[in-house]
Amino acid sequence: MEQTFIMIKPDGVQRGLIGEVICRFEKKGFTLKGLKLISVERSFAEKHYEDLSSKSFFSGLVDYIVSGPVVAMIWEGKNVVLTGRKIIGATNPAASEPGTIRGDFAIDIGRNVIHGSDSVESARKEIALWFPDGPVNWQSSVHPWVYET
C-alpha cells in the first residue's frame, strides 16, 4: 500500500490545527502509520529541503521550519500521495480551493500550515529521513470498510 509523508509546520502546530489535519486524513480513510512531535534542528531542515537550496527563499524556509515544533506523520492508503496533495491544497494558499487544508486555514505562502510529499519517490525519501526505524506495522480494522477486496 502506498505511503506519504505529511508534516504540520510550526504555524499549524501553534494554531492548534493538529487534530483538524489528522481528522481530515482519517475521515478520508487513510491509516496513520507514524506520528511524532519534533523540534527540528537546522541541519535536518536543510537536508529535508535540500532540493530547494538554490532558491532565494531557502534560508527563510529553514528559519520558519526550525522556529517551533512540527508534527511529522506517515499516512498509508490507495493513491495517498496524490489524494493527500488534494486534501492539502495548492502550495500558495491564495490558489487553494475552499475545503482544502490550505484553502481553509492559510493565507500566506510563507505560512502555509502543512507539507506533503509531491511524489511516491519523495515520500520514500522523506519517510526514510524522518522515520529511520520505519512506520508502525499495523492494519486498521476499518480497512475492509474503505477498500474493496
Swiss-Prot record:
Taking the first listed entry, what is the main subcellular location of this protein, grouped into a coarse class?
other
Report the record's Gene Ontology biological process terms: cellular response to hydrogen peroxide; CTP biosynthetic process; GTP biosynthetic process; UTP biosynthetic process
Cofactor(s) listed in the protein's UniProt record: Mg(2+)
Q: Which PROSITE patterns match?
A: NDPK, NDPK_LIKE
Q: Where in the cell is it found?
A: Peroxisome; Nucleus; Cytoplasm
**Catalytic reaction equation(s):** a 2'-deoxyribonucleoside 5'-diphosphate + ATP = a 2'-deoxyribonucleoside 5'-triphosphate + ADP; a ribonucleoside 5'-diphosphate + ATP = a ribonucleoside 5'-triphosphate + ADP
EC number in record: 2.7.4.6
Q: Where is the active site?
A: H115 (pros-phosphohistidine intermediate)
Enzyme class per UniProt: transferase
Which InterPro entries does the UniProt record give? NDK-like_dom, NDK-like_dom_sf, Nucleoside_diP_kinase, Nucleoside_diP_kinase_AS
Any one Gene Ontology MF annotation carried by this entry is: metal ion binding
Positions with a binding annotation for ATP: K9, F57, R85, T91, R102, N112
Q: Which UniProt keywords apply?
A: Acetylation, ATP-binding, Cytoplasm, Kinase, Magnesium, Metal-binding, Nucleotide metabolism, Nucleotide-binding, Nucleus, Peroxisome, Stress response, Transferase
Q: Which HAMAP family match?
A: NDP_kinase
Name the job this protein performs.
Major role in the synthesis of nucleoside triphosphates other than ATP. The ATP gamma phosphate is transferred to the NDP beta phosphate via a ping-pong mechanism, using a phosphorylated active-site intermediate. Plays a role in response to reactive oxygen species (ROS) stress.
Family recorded in the similarity comment: Belongs to the NDK family.
Oligomer and partners: Interacts with CAT1, CAT2 and CAT3.
The miscellaneous comment for this protein is: Plants over-expressing NDK1 are more tolerant to paraquat and have increased ability to eliminate exogenous H(2)O(2).
PANTHER family for this protein: NUCLEOSIDE DIPHOSPHATE KINASE (PTHR11349)
Name of this chain's protein = Nucleoside diphosphate kinase 1
Coding gene? NDK1
